[in-house]
């Protein structure tokens, strides 16, 4: 029996009820999770897979809340995240040492992001690697430079974001206009009686929050490991320029690096872009080799 064919609860019957129901599924200890994963891997035991899926439905819902600002029904976003969770359970290898939550976060986010991109493609939202990065990182980049105003960004803000994300100014302007709709409020009622709000459900999820924090710490460690391995593949100059431009809290300017290396500002920018593309390619290949993403 395939994991994808498992009967998993859906928020289609009412989001408030769904969120209440999934809280009834117990979390798994590390030993329980390992045992269930082995049962699925060795015997294709559907009950083992089902327990792994249901014990992580709250994790999916919590991750999905982070994508509520893209104008799509949150129930549909959760459903797509559940698809990613089932894929993670199918491919999970417990002997590699990390928990299912850590591994599943990659799949849940990828599934949700692909769904959002498919939905936004109806208005011809681009799907190049750079546009995907811009689509999912623009809000964070705006907050980092305190660009909280409504409407168009100031030219200096556009330039800062474009440099940080490695895209064109025009792409930042276009994407900002497409994503300028208001976010769903955390104070929006979950039920018709108005007694339960999004923030109530999120704040009460102490156990899943702890698991999420552990998973995020493990995921960060995995990403750092991939980054360190990929950096070795760069030349000394590429590594230095990329570090100075993209990995420091206070990036060195193109002009400063150009003076340091005795080349033009444009040449430094080209080296930075080339190094970043090489780094991304190497990290993705490593992630595929570790079975973290699809080829």
Curated annotation (Swiss-Prot):
Gene behind this protein: rpoH
Main function: Sigma factors are initiation factors that promote the attachment of RNA polymerase to specific initiation sites and are then released. This sigma factor is involved in regulation of expression of heat shock genes.
PANTHER family: RNA POLYMERASE SIGMA FACTOR RPOH, SIGMA FACTOR RPOH HEAT SHOCK RELATED
Keyword terms of this UniProt record: Cytoplasm, DNA-binding, Sigma factor, Stress response, Transcription, Transcription regulation
DNA-binding residue intervals: 254-273
Region listing for Sigma-70 factor domain-2, in residue ranges: 52-121
GO terms, biological process: DNA-templated transcription initiation; response to heat
Assembly notes: Interacts with the RNA polymerase core enzyme.
Organism: Caulobacter vibrioides (strain ATCC 19089 / CIP 103742 / CB 15)
Protein name: RNA polymerase sigma factor RpoH
């Amino acid at each position: 029996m395939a994991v994808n064919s498992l009967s998993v609860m859906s928020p289609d019957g009412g989001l408030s009820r769904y969120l209440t129901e999934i809280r009834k599924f117990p979390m798994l200890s590390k030993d329980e999770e390992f045992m269930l994963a082995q049962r699925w891997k060795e015997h294709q035991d559907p009950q083992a897979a089902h327990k792994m899926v249901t014990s992580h439905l709250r994790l999916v819902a919590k991750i999905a809340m982070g994508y509520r600002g893209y104008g799509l029904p949150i129930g549909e976003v959760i459903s797509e995240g559940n698809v990613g969770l089932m894929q993670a359970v199918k491919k999970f290898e417990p002997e590699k040492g990390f928990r299912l939550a850590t591994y599943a976060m990659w799949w849940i986010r990828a599934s949700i992001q692909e769904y959002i991109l498919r939905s936004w493609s109806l208005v011809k939202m681009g799907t190049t690697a750079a546009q995907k990065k811009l689509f999912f990182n623009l809000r964070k980049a705006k907050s980092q430079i305190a660009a909280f105003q409504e409407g168009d960004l100031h030219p200096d803000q556009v330039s800062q974001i474009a440099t940080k994300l490695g895209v064109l100014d025009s792409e930042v302007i276009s994407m900002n206009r497409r994503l300028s709709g208001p976010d769903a409020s955390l104070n929006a009622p979950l039920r018709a009686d108005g007694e339960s709000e999004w923030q109530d459900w999120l704040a009460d999820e102490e156990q899943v929050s702890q698991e999420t924090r552990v998973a995020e710490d493990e995921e960060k460690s995995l990403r750092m490991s991939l980054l360190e391995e990929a950096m070795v593949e760069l030349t000394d100059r590429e590594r230095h320029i990329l570090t100075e431009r993209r990995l420091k809290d206070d990036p060195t300017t193109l002009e400063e690096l150009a003076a340091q290396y005795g080349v033009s500002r444009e040449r430094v920018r080209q080296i930075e872009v080339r190094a970043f593309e090489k780094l991304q390619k190497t990290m993705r290949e490593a992630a595929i080799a570790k079975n973290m993403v699809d080829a």
